[in-house]
Amino acid sequence: MGPLSREAWAQRLGSFRASPSAFLAGAEGEDLGHDLLSDLRSEKLSELIKVSLLTLSLEYSDKLWPDALAAEAAATSLLDTLVLLPSKPSALRRLLLLAATTALVSGGALGPTSEASSRLLPLLLGLASGQDMGRSFGTTSEQRHLQATACECLGELERCKPGLLAGALGVLRSLLGQKGPIQPVSLLLALVLHNTLVVQSRFGAGLQGLLVAKDSSPGSCPWDWTLAEEWDDHLKPQAHGWPTAGEEERDFPILDPNPEDTRELKAAVAQLLDTSYLLTPVAQAQLVWLLGWALQGLRGQPPVLFKPQLVRLLGTAQLTLLHSVLSLKAAFGEALFTAQDEALLLRRLTLVAQHPALPSPTHLFYLHCILSFPENCPLGPEGEEAAPLLLGPQLRRGLMPSLLHDPMVLLARLHLLCLLCADDEEEEKGQLQGPQWFLQELLAGLQQRAAVDGGPRALATLCFQASYLVTSCLTRQPTVQTSLVHGLAQLYRARPSLAPHFVDLLDEVSPELREPLRKVLLREVVARPGKNEALRWHLQMLAKVAEGATQSAILGFLQAAAIHCTDWGLHQALLRVCRALLRTGGGEGLADLLQELARQLENADGRDHARLYYVLLSHLSSSKLGMALGPSLAAPALASSLMAENQGFASALMVQETSAPIQLSVGPQKAKGPLPVLHLQVQALDTPVYSLELRFRVEGQLYEPVEAVHIPSVRPGQPAHPLHLPLQPRSPAPARLHVRALYTTPAGLTCHAHLPPLSVNFADLFLPFPQLPKGSELCFFDELWNSCLPKGVESRVWCPLGPQGLEALVSQHLEPFVVVAQPPTTYLIAVRLPPHSMLLLRLEKAQVHGVPVALRTDDWAVLPLVGDYLRGLAAH
């Protein structure tokens, strides 16, 4: 069968794109991939049609060649077609390279046993190196244009098989000084360098001279399939979370290169950074992130290599580059950014965020950067939201929210205002227009706009979003909470149709606001019975706020409202309020009301419900009424009512998700042994738990996987069950453990529940050095102190002292790690940080408000953690 015509291919491609799965399932779909590869070599089809065919293969490679065998054959055919192209310039060469790479990757055929892979890799590296590959690949000028495409293909292969191109590092580095496209080569080199550092650190290997070019010929370049195959989980690096998020996904490589590799590594990174200004902003951001992420945990490599770029990047107007700067700041902190740099960066963010011509997305980006600004020395516990310390009155004045702002911008600025109010708890009495005054004025304006009868629903939604944000951020501000409750009560009085919004707000707010708001809304409802539509909203609100309230006023309201309940919807709303009262025990007045409703309601369904509620009230005690009418404790009902009879059987076969039946807490830690151990305590809450299995997951890849723990049984009332959880950090950094419990109930059902995450603090990783012979302590410490340099780093930190003094502080927090003690003047402290680091402290003579601390470590990445730890000792 000959090649299809242009019209036939156009019709076939159109049918395929309309529904790929349906087309491939039909008769024509069986030979689509074969026909496509065959017709690419036909001289009867124009180049434009072939471009369409190759574009289709790029978009739907996984459907055309779904398995490794088909993908291998397709890639081989595409490479053969590439070789057979005439020497004249052609747009097909670039697409053929991309199509062959895509087929191998999407089909899972990329590997050391793949013949197509062994042909493609040398070809791509040769094109990327600018070598003359022969007339089959076009003229020399056209081959230069293929360099960028070859770099893109190599980058895709490296992402799929990290460490594959480690042996080509020297060749790729040599390309930076040659003529050719700078951006593709720079990004490829940065990616390969990043993956090589991480992959080599996984197996404890060094760079082994990989950065030095030995032989640039494509045939002799060693493809490191060993590392690529052993690293079975593809790298999926994420941008560093900022400290306020508390959910960083960091994976610090631990690598200690020899001096020669260190020099070459510094030179390669400096070379990449020096030429980064020639790249597009997005490419620059990617390059900076890759290098920063790779070097973050590399021993002996402080981030000063990035310092020359800060002068240029701090003044950038590109959002992507600004985000990279903030990511570097979050990663390296005061090790890279001075206090002047921090003040300049925050001032710039603040001033730009006030520009009136900013588009809304850009405006929100700058506000988010301010809200999540990674500070060098943050106050308060890690993960707690707070406004930047350097955001003084002059800077914050232009960031106040206004009713004229876009809703999302208003909420972002309101979030910042709430954080400022939280910091200004001790406002001066003479301050007339402080943050709290401004906040109350803004809330009053939002409530007035939402109270307009018939006004836009968006204004009401914005008002409740702002109210929720305020109560979430200012739970400990009674003045603001009281003002907010009063304003919301006035809003309901003016516009009862907003009852659904109030119900949602009551479900979401904290108990500090829920109870006073419930009482105020209850008073507003019973004071204004209303008719028709207003009555419908009052009954909906009353069903939410009636529980726990005195019933006399509510029953009077219901008796007056029953006269106006004329349709089925109002009947149901009235009965929902009665049900809410029944859950709290009911009473004689409620029994009379239910009897009256059972006689008077026009709807038969309503009369039956009223009669049922009366029977329950007459025959059940208050506690049993609450259980019968409260939320069901059983498993959720099945979707089909036909399966109701088998409900219990189905529940017994399924693992049900429930609320946590146990409490897991962190006990006092003991620093001893070769590995840090997290001491936990498990306690049952209300019911016994059997065959308990606790599964732990560490955020990111900071630690080795934590094994599950099995406990035969835990009963309430018994002492807490001790649990020792060994940790194997890959780098000395704090982390969070997500915990899931799988257990059996006394009824024999298997359930699972998510427990609150556990925090592993930096101090929980501290381990002491082995016990030393008496008299050798000082010499041992001096040897450790001298061994830290020049590979390590030295710094000085001011440690505030509380009222307890230096001796008490050392005794409480650092006693197991003291090597030499000369109280009350000097303490020499040595700490082991798993897996292979150490921290040395010299606490000198204490002064009035603190003590100067000289420290050395062989891992500069722990400097910000050490600074935060020492500054926070006085608070504990």
From Swiss-Prot:
This protein's record includes keyword ATP-binding: no
Keyword field: Protein transport, Transport
Pfam families: AP5B1_barrel (PF21589), AP5B1_C (PF21590), AP5B1_middle (PF21588), AP5B1_N (PF21587)
GO cellular component: AP-type membrane coat adaptor complex
Gene Ontology process terms (BP): endosomal transport; protein transport
Physiological role: As part of AP-5, a probable fifth adaptor protein complex, it may be involved in endosomal transport.
Subunit structure: Probably part of the adaptor protein complex 5 (AP-5), a tetramer composed of AP5B1, AP5M1, AP5S1 and AP5Z1. Interacts with ZFYVE26 and SPG11.
UniProt-recorded name of the protein: AP-5 complex subunit beta-1
Species annotation: Rattus norvegicus
